[in-house]
Amino acid sequence: ELFDISWEADDNSGLRSHHLFYRIDDSDEFIFIDSVASDLDDYSWQIPEALQTDSCQIQIETYDLVNLSSNDTSNYFSIADGISPVVQQVILVTEYIQEHDSLTVSWEATDNIGLDSIQIYYSNDNGSNFLLMGSLGASLDGFSFVIPPGVSESALVKLIVKDFAGNEGEGISEIFAVADNTPPSISIESPISGTTVGIGSFCTLSWT
């Protein structure tokens, strides 16, 4: 992310250059950013991706034509992580599975600062609806869950990955098929318990 820095400087003999530095967390050392020509009074700083702090300062040191210098340091400001995690891939061990069987999912995900948590969702209608199957810490890179009932030709798994700043990244698996593995159910409705039927008479059976 770009951060705009601006300043005012003048000198009786003329200016030569401006040198920009930053420091974090009250460090004694300022880190060099860049140097610019004397006619400039602003700069767009590309903040390093891994830099996150509640106390950052900018220092500008200005040189004149006879090599005398002076500097000024900004007030403290914060740098927040605004970069979302990236899910490179969601890996399934199969392209076909039955209901009630266990599906193993693995993934590769990265973040500029660090990952915090992962949520795993399942859909059997090509992503129109999702069911949360599990939440876990980012130290894990695999998870298994039991496929719920429901035959499908367009099932998929979605991951939502969060970093420590609350930024989210998303990854979706390839579509896979879910086959029928649910036995039929039957319930006899009649005759009911305690019914007496005479020998040679008809007995009506019904069921659902």
Region locations from a protein language model:
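Short, solvent-exposed loop/linker segments at the N-terminal edge
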Residues: E1, T94-D101, G194-S201
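Extracellular acidic, Ser/Thr/Pro-rich low-complexity tracts
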Residues: S6-S13, D64, D81, E108-I113, ...
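Solvent-exposed loop/turn segments flanking beta-strands in beta-repeat/beta-sandwich domains
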Residues: D11-F21, D111-I120
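Conserved Ser/Thr-centered positions that define the repeating blades of beta-propeller domains
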Residues: R23, S123-N124, P191
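Short strand-edge motifs at loop-to-beta-strand transitions and within beta-strands
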Residues: D41-W45, D141-F145
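Surface-exposed, short loops/turns at beta-strand junctions within beta-sandwich domains
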Residues: E49-D54, P149-E153
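Conserved structural position at the C-terminal beta-strand
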Residues: I60-T62, L159-V161
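Proline-enriched interdomain boundary motifs that mark the N-terminal boundary
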Residues: I83-I91, T182-S190
